[in-house]
């Protein structure tokens, strides 16, 4: 457990591709997807925040602080991140989505190592083929930069990354760690793969 790192699990989206069902609460292997994410990151961080814009009471049942976007317009992952950045007192904030049930057990360790090695402002995970834009470790002091970005009407997360010294943490040895579930079909495929 790191005393300098808190985490936010992003569960604030509209889940259009999941038929509007709240992805964090969709069951995979008999438990809500967010529970898989919690179990994976809990040993790696000090505190966990859950960013949710609906079903807040249900999310609170997991025993962690639930925060809703400061702006209620469903502005995407940056809105959840900026809200969490304003809530944490930690040196770093880990950001993960609620629909990645196979996150690495060494996620924080490797991301922090890469961030410090490059003296970067943030580190984003890569599965070896592509970067995972909502799996990152960042300094909460970047909040003002993110606020200015959002206030300018910007929403593309990678455009915001480009404004900062961004390290890339390589997880090509764990290519399935960032498999996420956006559709009922993907949920079924992942459930079958886990059961094997």
UniProtKB/Swiss-Prot annotation:
GO BP field: bis(molybdopterin guanine dinucleotide)molybdenum biosynthetic process
Enzyme class, first EC level, given as a word: transferase
Superkingdom to which the source organism belongs: Bacteria
GO MF term set: GTP binding; metal ion binding; molybdenum cofactor guanylyltransferase activity
Signal peptide annotation: none
Entry EC number(s): 2.7.7.77
Swiss-Prot/TrEMBL cofactor(s): Mg(2+)
Listed Pfam families: NTP_transf_3 (PF12804)
Principal place of residence: cytoplasm
Membrane-crossing residue ranges in chain numbering: none
GO cellular component, one term: cytoplasm
Keyword Translocase among UniProt keywords: no
CDD domains, per the entry: MobA
InterPro entries: MobA-like_NTP_Trfase (IPR025877), Molybde_CF_guanTrfase (IPR013482), Nucleotide-diphossugar_trans (IPR029044)
Catalytic activity: Mo-molybdopterin + GTP + H(+) = Mo-molybdopterin guanine dinucleotide + diphosphate
UniProt binding sites for Mg(2+): 99
Entry keyword Nucleus: no
Record's function text: Transfers a GMP moiety from GTP to Mo-molybdopterin (Mo-MPT) cofactor (Moco or molybdenum cofactor) to form Mo-molybdopterin guanine dinucleotide (Mo-MGD) cofactor.
Description of how the protein assembles with itself and partners: Monomer.
Domain notes: The N-terminal domain determines nucleotide recognition and specific binding, while the C-terminal domain determines the specific binding to the target protein.
Similarity-based family: Belongs to the MobA family.
Protein name: Molybdenum cofactor guanylyltransferase
Organism: Shewanella sediminis (strain HAW-EB3)
């Amino acid at each position: 457990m790191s005393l300098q790192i808190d985490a936010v699990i992003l569960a604030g989206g509209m889940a259009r591709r999941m038929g509007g069902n709240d992805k964090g609460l969709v069951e995979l292997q008999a438990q809500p997807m967010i529970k898989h994410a919690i179990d994976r990151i809990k040993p790696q961080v000090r505190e966990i925040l859950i960013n949710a814009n609906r079903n807040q009471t249900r999310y609170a049942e997991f025993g962690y602080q639930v925060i809703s976007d400061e702006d209620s317009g469903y502005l995407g992952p940056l809105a959840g991140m900026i809200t969490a950045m304003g809530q944490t007192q930690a040196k770093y904030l880990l950001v993960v989505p609620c629909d990645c049930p196979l996150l690495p057990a060494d996620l924080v360790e490797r991301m922090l190592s890469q961030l410090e090695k490059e003296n970067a402002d943030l580190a984003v995970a890569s599965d070896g083929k592509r970067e995972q834009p909502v799996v990152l470790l960042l300094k909460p002091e970047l909040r003002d930069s993110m606020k200015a970005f959002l206030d300018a009407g910007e929403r593309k997360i990678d455009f915001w990354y480009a404004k900062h010294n961004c390290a890339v943490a390589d997880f090509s040895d764990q290519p399935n760690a960032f498999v996420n579930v956006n559709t009922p079909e993907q949920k079924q495929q992942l459930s079958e793969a886990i059961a094997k």
